[in-house]
A protein has these predicted regions:
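Short, charged, surface-exposed secondary-structure boundary motifs
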Residues: 57-58, 76-80, 115-117, 139-141, ...
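Gly/Ser/Thr-rich loops at beta-strand to alpha-helix junctions
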Residues: 89-90, 169-177, 299-304
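Short hydrophobic/aromatic-enriched beta-strand-loop microsegments
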Residues: 65-69, 187-194, 313-322
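Active-site-proximal loop/helix segment associated with metal-binding centers of metalloenzymes
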Residues: 87-97, 110, 114-115, 128, ...
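C-terminal regulatory/interaction regions
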Residues: 185, 216-348
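His/Asp/Glu-rich metal-coordinating catalytic cores
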Residues: 2-15, 19-24, 28, 34-167, ...
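Short acidic low-complexity segments
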Residues: 10-23, 72-75, 212-228, 234-241
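Hard-cation-handling environments
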Residues: 149-227, 231
């Protein structure tokens, strides 16, 4: 019997009596991170990393939360369980499950480049690895994040010369905090959409150091924004809310900006290839370093990525789940099928 089963409620460890990132309410849920496609309301008990707990409280409301540190060991009905850094966002964790000599690891979402706030991705040796493949095609290859940060700084400087407000679109948990760190040493006044401001306040209350942030508010005079920087979720694009910053220009921060057509279709002033997910090489590196004999692929470019792993001699299979992009990130990826041929064999 498999240590983790793929059920209609989520990833289930029968021996331990718990689910990992269930998409339906269950008795005991172990959560990899606070994004809405992995952390859902309604379960009776939640286990997560210490930094994830306040974010679950923000998003799901009061609940029965238990939190642990990375590497701390728990036993559930004789099953050994521990959390390890995934590098996706603050608090994001891989879940290591061990029982009767068998080790499985559930990655959740992850990236392999250390962003300085999410914890460096930790390869965890296992027999079976359950991975995402959001950017599981060879066309997705990230440049070092510092190069992207430099481009963002230069773009903002050019906008200021023409009196334009720079509006950066980035989802409220993960990317927004990276941008705040990126802009921390500037003398610019930083403004944020309410969703980003609320997350910022919670994180600051729990010891995180981010630059001062002003919430966008109807009572603020319009000229206060001119030449400044506004950080907003992608869902704000094209709304009446964003038009109050006129004259403004939009910069989208997403891995989907690797494909230029996405930027053209969304009429953005700039696209910055900044992702909280591993690229093609990062996915392959992570899998190699686990030493896994079996790899299950939960979401993303599952067919192409799983096929490639099988061709490399690693048993791999697709798994149907309800994971995908964080809701607001999905707005950026809806056109990806026009740019990437899913039937094309990876050529690396």
């Amino acid at each position: 019997m498999a240590l983790i089963e793929f059920t209609d409620k989520g990833l289930y460890c029968k021996a331990g009596g718990f689910y990992i990132d269930p998409w339906k309410p269950v008795e005991r849920a172990v959560i990899t991170h606070a994004h809405s496609d992995h952390a859902r309301w309604g379960s009776k008990q939640y286990l997560c990393h210490r930094d994830t707990e306040p974010l679950l409280n923000l998003r799901l409301g009061p609940g029965n939360y238990q939190s642990v540190e990375w590497g701390e060991t728990l036993f559930m009905q004789g099953v050994k369980l521990s959390l390890h850094p995934a590098g996706h966002m603050i608090g994001s964790s891989q879940i290591r499950v061990e029982y009767q000599g068998e080790v499985w690891v559930v990655s959740g979402d992850y990236k392999t480049e250390n962003d300085g706030i999410s914890g460096a991705f930790e390869p965890v040796r296992c027999h079976t690895f359950i991975t995402e493949s959001t950017f599981g095609l060879p066309i997705y290859n990230w440049e070092p994040q510092q190069l992207i940060y430099n481009r963002i700084h230069n773009w903002i400087a050019e906008n200021r010369k023409t009196g334009k407000t720079s509006v950066l679109l980035a989802y409220s948990l993960g990317k927004a905090q990276r941008l705040l760190r990126c802009l921390a040493e500037t003398d610019l006044e930083l403004f944020a959409h309410g969703a980003i401001y609320n997350a910022d306040q919670v994180l600051k209350q729990h010891g995180w150091a981010f630059p001062d942030l002003t919430r966008v508010h109807p009572e603020l005079p319009k000229d206060r924004y001119q030449g400044g920087v506004v950080i907003a979720p992608p869902s704000a694009d094209g709304s009446a809310w964003i038009r109050k910053f006129h004259p403004y220009t939009v910069g989208i921060c997403s891995g989907w900006m690797q494909v230029r057509g996405n930027r053209r279709r969304r009429n953005a002033g700039a696209g910055f290839v900044l992702s909280d997910h591993a690229d093609w090489n990062g996915l392959l590196q992570a899998i190699r370093e686990t030493g896994a004999e079996r790899v299950y692929v939960t979401h993303g470019f599952q067919a192409a990525f799983s096929r490639y792993l099988n061709e490399q001699g690693i048993f791999s299979a697709e798994v149907k789940t309800e994971y995908g992009q964080e809701e607001e990130e999905a707005l950026l990826s809806e056109d990806q099928v026009h740019e990437a041929n899913l039937n094309e064999e990876p050529n690396v």
